[in-house]
């Protein structure tokens, strides 16, 4: 059996500190080195988010002036402060100062300013900052967490500005054979899949969704893997053929096309549909509760289309567990059974009661 090494994260560092801490600084240094965590700033942020105040206070003196300015922004945002413009400008000045300069953090802070400008309606200013930040981070910290975020934020801004083709171009910079995080690749391919589908490029849309599903699994992002997997199936439902090449082979053989090349025809082997469906079903949360359950909605809809409603027999017998009104409405019409229709109609009435 293949052994998968799960990467250590700043969150793991905090967990280890809670198990064995407090410890001396030398021990913290050893943990940081063993976990291959790039900076104390990453650990400080995790300590803030995970409410490890004592660890944060121990790490804080290790931060550079630019890192302290950055963590100050993080803390203010956590406390709900939305008026961060002056604090961001001050942090940028610290990161630019020759005595305290930090090229990577300057890129991150310009990204922060771009997001703040977008929130305040300054679209052009946001575009300038996000593009500048992405170029800087590409040059000094390519494929780092901050560089990945800058690419995803640029693409999101372009989508918000109704420029999907430009967003698609940004997503293409996140290569699958580079050093980008699997989570970043998965997010980018979900976005690219939806754009391609909107353009009618169904083969590319399905290919991107397939890749997103695979990389989300590698990133241990189960919810994202289910989102990508159901997207792949939904895109493929009208194009299933037992004679189709397996999707992974089609993906591996896909090559960039010239303008004059025709769009490949999407044909999907039913074994790939079954494999993705079975994985998604096996990895659904144990609970059916929650007012917003797009995962269950998608899976129930797909199950109806591919004659696999028996996978949800237990769900159909537990109407009181369902809190999503849209899901209840979908389940009500899944079976041609009077009692089933009545029970779920009653549940839907309760959920939609004003």
Regions found by a protein language model. Give the residues of each.
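C-terminal non-catalytic interaction modules
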Residues: 1-24, 229, 236, 241-354
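Residues that mark the junctions of alpha-helical repeat units in TPR/alpha-solenoid scaffolds
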Residues: 29, 36, 65-68, 99, ...
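Residue-level detector of the short coil/turn that links helix A to helix B
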Residues: 47, 51-54, 82-83, 121, ...
């Amino acid at each position: 059996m293949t052994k998968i090494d799960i990467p250590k994260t700043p969150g793991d560092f905090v967990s280890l500190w809670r198990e064995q801490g407090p410890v001396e600084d030398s021990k913290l240094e050893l943990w940081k080195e063993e976990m291959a965590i790039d900076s104390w700033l990453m650990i400080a942020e995790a300590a803030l988010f995970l409410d490890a105040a004592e660890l944060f206070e121990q790490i804080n003196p290790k931060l550079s002036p630019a890192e302290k300015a950055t963590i100050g922004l993080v803390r203010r945002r956590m406390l709900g402060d939305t008026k961060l413009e002056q604090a961001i400008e001050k942090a940028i000045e610290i990161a630019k100062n020759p005595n305290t300069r930090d090229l990577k953090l300057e890129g991150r802070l310009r990204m922060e300013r771009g997001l703040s400008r977008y929130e305040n309606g300054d679209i052009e200013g946001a575009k300038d900052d996000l593009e500048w930040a992405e170029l800087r981070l590409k040059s000094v910290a390519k494929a780092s967490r901050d560089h990945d975020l800058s690419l995803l934020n640029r693409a999101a801004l372009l989508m918000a500005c109704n420029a999907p083709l430009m967003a698609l171009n940004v997503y293409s910079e996140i290569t699958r054979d580079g050093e980008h995080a699997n989570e970043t690749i998965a997010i980018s391919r979900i976005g690219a899949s939806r754009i391609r589908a909107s353009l009618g490029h169904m083969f590319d849309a399905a290919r991107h969704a397939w890749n997103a599903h695979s990389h989300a699994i590698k990133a241990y992002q189960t919810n994202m893997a289910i989102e990508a997997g159901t997207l792949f199936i939904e895109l493929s439902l009208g194009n299933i053929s037992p004679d189709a090449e397996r999707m992974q082979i089609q993906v591996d053989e896909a090559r960039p096309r010239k303008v004059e090349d025709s769009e490949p025809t999407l044909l999907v082997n039913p074994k790939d549909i079954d494999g993705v469906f079975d994985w998604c079903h096996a990895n659904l949360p144990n609970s059916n509760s929650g007012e917003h359950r797009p995962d269950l909605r998608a899976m129930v809809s797909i199950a109806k289309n591919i004659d696999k409603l028996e996978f949800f027999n237990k769900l159909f017998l537990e109407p009181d567990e369902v809190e999503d009104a849209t899901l209840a409405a979908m389940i009500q019409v899944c079976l041609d059974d009077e009692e089933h229709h009545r029970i779920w109609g009653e549940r839907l009435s309760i959920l939609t009661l004003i």
